[in-house]
């Protein structure tokens, strides 16, 4: 694999020599940083099993190498990478996998270690959504996830990835993570804080990642990380699990932040060792039981992961000063709820007791039941999934609901050919040789839902959202 020139400040190299265990080679560290990062994917088990996915892509000749800490994760090599970007494959467009760096699968593996089954989870710094979608898959789309993102521009990307992967149990917020300890004290069974950091571990993906690096900026970032971790720890219920992670390598932003929490809250903090998380995890194990992953150990990005348990309750933080405002939704119950449910079921949209119907004017939504106790305590950017808009003739079913809820074996399901599926993603109407019998059509490809559409004569009218329509080469290789 070709080398690429990485910029290393001298002070950074000095710091790494001091931080790296004597069991590791500094020369191998430099060499690993110069190699481009291996690509990796995570199969979305909400939509397909690992075995079925491997069978589906077997004809493509992709070379997949299992990632030891994630059963559904694989490093991938493809001969046709330049001809067809991985993000333009049919399997990616329909949400069957997520393009995710192998190291970033570690925090969620740690969060669910030791048969942990949390029902209410917060992902405090969630965009672009790789870990939120991984958490949702581990939860089987049950319970609820509060996915927070401070950057307004990244909230839209977060929602797009959640929708593509068919996730229904998530609420989005847009806050500085430092508010949650006061706003939602001891409300969560598990919290992931993948903290903003100096990004020292990503040089294999971005050779210029260290252009603005300085020891002083590391200390400034660590101060913010301590405040975020303090907030997360207050939002965690006693007995709950918190995972703190970064994609950086210095001790100030990693071990020192976790040790500060232990010093501050003493016996309320228990470090949970990660040496048994996967085979050979001990190669990255610190004396405290954390994983400090230098890039040469597993040939991946540099990363840090710590897992801890909250052993006792803490005094509350000062109450937040903001006002949440009136909640604009009302529960949909009785005859109205039954009517919506029956109409949705008739077109192949199904859900269980984990999701409850709510209404705002003519909009019908499904909210995860576990989130309802947080209503009125925090302002949501988006909550659950929009199911439909009501109109005089019935309901206009929403694309995100179809991707999350549709049953591909429903009587109205209509399987497209590969050429027709590509036309669908280009936003074009479909003219099948044998049109479907029903007027309401659940369009599928590879037995995955692509959308709900109307049959007009011999034509299936395209309903794929305009903002998702794709140009350029797609999976048939045609432009």
Curated annotation (Swiss-Prot):
Keywords, sorted A to Z: Cytoplasm, Methyltransferase, RNA-binding, rRNA processing, S-adenosyl-L-methionine, Transferase
Gene Ontology molecular function: any one: RNA binding
Subcellular location: Cytoplasm
Active site: 247 (nucleophile)
Listed EC numbers: 2.1.1.178
Gene Ontology CC entries for this record: cytoplasm
PROSITE patterns: NOL1_NOP2_SUN, SAM_MT_RSMB_NOP
Single Gene Ontology BP annotation: rRNA base methylation
Superkingdom, taxonomy of origin: Bacteria
Residues engaged in binding S-adenosyl-L-methionine: 125-131, 149, 176, 194
Catalytic activity: cytidine(1407) in 16S rRNA + S-adenosyl-L-methionine = 5-methylcytidine(1407) in 16S rRNA + S-adenosyl-L-homocysteine + H(+)
Chief site of localization: cytoplasm
CDD domains: AdoMet_MTases
Family: Belongs to the class I-like SAM-binding methyltransferase superfamily. RsmB/NOP family.
Task of the protein: Specifically methylates the cytosine at position 1407 (m5C1407) of 16S rRNA.
HAMAP family xrefs: 16SrRNA_methyltr_F
Name of the featured protein: Ribosomal RNA small subunit methyltransferase F
Native source organism of the sequence: Salmonella paratyphi C (strain RKS4594)
Source taxonomy: Bacteria, Pseudomonadati, Pseudomonadota, Gammaproteobacteria, Enterobacterales
Gene: rsmF
